[in-house]
Amino acid sequence: MIKSKLFAKHKNISHGFFNSLGGYSNGIYKSLNCGIGSKDNKININQNLKKVCQKIKCSRKNLILLNQIHSNKVFSINRTPKKKPLGDALVTSKNKLALGILTADCAPVFIIDPKKKIISAIHAGWKGAYKKIIYKTIYKLKKKGSSIKDLYAVIGPCISKKNYEVKKDFLKKFTVRNKKN
């Protein structure tokens, strides 16, 4: 588990970025596969999720996951939902709830407000980033009472610029919007 030094200062907030090592899955899924929607053996997935929960000290019932769709949909969570929300970011101020997202190439982004005790987890792929999912998550944090000056953010492991080739027309989508991109 990879931890942010920035977030480690806030003892009341547990977090971690997991890689694919040390899981129960095998074959083509040989990893710490937590993708409930994958064709991996469900027993292995549940063992992997249990392992993650033990590491971050939460019950499996309180680990909230999404059906990620590369969108800009952000959900405020106050209790464990009956089924996984369809979107790419979660926000909560409820103690004992853990927010989880799954990534490979996309960027996992955590934003916290330690003063208001509000946390968020964002699955930021290029489509979600283009559709302003991070901005929309910050907006949701502000609606819950956060101030920008109190927010801390970390980006977890994701694909590097060197390994993510794009064509000029793709790049233009982002640079037309903002020359600094």
Model-assigned labels for residue ranges:
Residues 1-181:
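Active-site microenvironment for binding and transforming phosphate-containing groups
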